[in-house]
Amino acid sequence: MEICRGLRSHLITLLLFLFHSETICRPSGRKSSKMQAFRIWDVNQKTFYLRNNQLVAGYLQGPNVNLEEKIDVVPIEPHALFLGIHGGKMCLSCVKSGDETRLQLEAVNITDLSENRKQDKRFAFIRSDSGPTTSFESAACPGWFLCTAMEADQPVSLTNMPDEGVMVTKFYFQEDE
């Protein structure tokens, strides 16, 4: 009888420890607005860089590899995020003007954006992973995807024809170390 009571006591202690640890280790459900830097390059190996204040995709070699722009990311939902460059001081946005939809860089601090403000929706992108690649759809302009041209040194833009093969909409997206 004494052995059973001792085992039961140890078992209860073990269970309390396990459940207590699980509660402490589990995320609280609050989203993190912490900015993280990522490397991005398209499936044709073109990386992003800035040329005349415009985001461009091309093949950087030699000393030019230092021109590569890291993408600053602030997650806002499980698959939605804000994208920026230059330490989050310039943000990518989807702007619709008449029939034209275009990608532009805006001088906005990425950490000042909020998923709850309607005017900030133009900065939000939906991330979709497919195997090793990722695509980014505009939250403000559904059906419009971040893309690069087939040719090098062309502006990063948006397309509403992701499967036509004219523009590249699949990217490798890796947290920068």
Curated annotation (Swiss-Prot):
It is linked to Microvascular complications of diabetes 4: Pathological conditions that develop in numerous tissues and organs as a consequence of diabetes mellitus. They include diabetic retinopathy, diabetic nephropathy leading to end-stage renal disease, and diabetic neuropathy. Diabetic retinopathy remains the major cause of new-onset blindness among diabetic adults. It is characterized by vascular permeability and increased tissue ischemia and angiogenesis. Chronic recurrent multifocal osteomyelitis 2, with periostitis and pustulosis: An autosomal recessive, autoinflammatory disease of skin and bone resulting in sterile multifocal osteomyelitis, periostitis, and pustulosis from birth. The term autoinflammatory disease describes a group of disorders characterized by attacks of seemingly unprovoked inflammation without significant levels of autoantibodies and autoreactive T-cells. Glycans are attached at residue 109. It comes from Homo sapiens (Human). Residues 1-25 form the signal peptide. CDD domains: beta-trefoil_IL1RA. This is Interleukin-1 receptor antagonist protein. One of its GO terms (molecular function) is interleukin-1 type II receptor antagonist activity. One of its GO terms (biological process) is insulin secretion. InterPro entries: IL-1_CS, IL-1_fam, IL-1RA/IL-36, IL1/FGF. Keywords: Cytoplasm, Disulfide bond, Glycoprotein, Pharmaceutical, Secreted, Signal. The intracellular form of IL1RN is predominantly expressed in epithelial cells.
